[in-house]
Amino acid sequence: MSRVGRVERTTKETSVLVEIDLDGSGKVDVSTGVGFYDHMLDQLGRHGLFDLTVKTEGDLHIDSHHTIEDTALALGAAFKQALGDKVGIYRFGNCTVPLDESLAQVTVDLSGRPYLVHTEPENMAPMIGEYDTTMTRHILESFVAQAQIALHVHVPYGRNAHHIVECQFKALARALRYASERDPRAAGILPSTKGAL
């Protein structure tokens, strides 16, 4: 059974198309107009082994906020759609990823209950190119709200802002991959004692 999610979201601020195949091979085609964000979404697809298409046109003449936020909302909704009934998945996933001096620890529960815990070093550089580093948390908040997952992201240390953000996306990719993969020992079983996720 195909596990593909496709979401189109159009407002006066943005036009977004996201398609994700959870059982892909890491093929990525991303264009948001925000170079560093494209780079992070590329990490998400490649390290999650998700086939990921993202096409966003936004009001970048103002700034990148709406473009980044609406893309994350659509991505979360597409991920939830692709998960389907969640029967037979592992449900939980975690991964720790270093990037030189930075380290990210990510744990996810595909629980149906949106919750985010996010910590990263203070006093990060405010910008990476056109990317506002305060948007990383907002991306995760937006994704979690629509995907309806519990997500814990912890960066205990790091100096370079690029590395701090990138290791979060890489660890998130792997954690989502592990949680969403099918468990051969649990075929046909919903991973919940209450019978619903």
UniProtKB/Swiss-Prot annotation:
Q: Does the record carry Nucleotidyltransferase as a key word?
A: no
Q: Which reaction does it catalyse?
A: D-erythro-1-(imidazol-4-yl)glycerol 3-phosphate = 3-(imidazol-4-yl)-2-oxopropyl phosphate + H2O
Q: Which UniProt keywords apply?
A: Amino-acid biosynthesis, Cytoplasm, Histidine biosynthesis, Lyase
EC numbers for this chain: 4.2.1.19
Pathway named in the protein's UniProt entry: Amino-acid biosynthesis; L-histidine biosynthesis; L-histidine from 5-phospho-alpha-D-ribose 1-diphosphate: step 6/9
Molecular-function GO terms, alphabetical: imidazoleglycerol-phosphate dehydratase activity
- Does Oxidoreductase show up as a keyword for this record? no
Q: Which InterPro entries match?
A: IGPD_sf, ImidazoleglycerolP_deHydtase, ImidazoleglycerP_deHydtase_CS, Ribosomal_Su5_D2-typ_SF
Gene Ontology biological-process annotations: L-histidine biosynthetic process
Q: Which domain of life is it from?
A: Bacteria
According to its UniProt record, where is this protein located? Cytoplasm
Transmembrane region(s): none
* GO-annotated cellular components: cytoplasm
| Family from the record | Belongs to the imidazoleglycerol-phosphate dehydratase family.
Which PANTHER family does this one have? IMIDAZOLEGLYCEROL-PHOSPHATE DEHYDRATASE, IMIDAZOLEGLYCEROL-PHOSPHATE DEHYDRATASE HIS7
Q: What is this protein called?
A: Imidazoleglycerol-phosphate dehydratase
Give the species: Streptomyces avermitilis (strain ATCC 31267 / DSM 46492 / JCM 5070 / NBRC 14893 / NCIMB 12804 / NRRL 8165 / MA-4680)
| Underlying gene | hisB
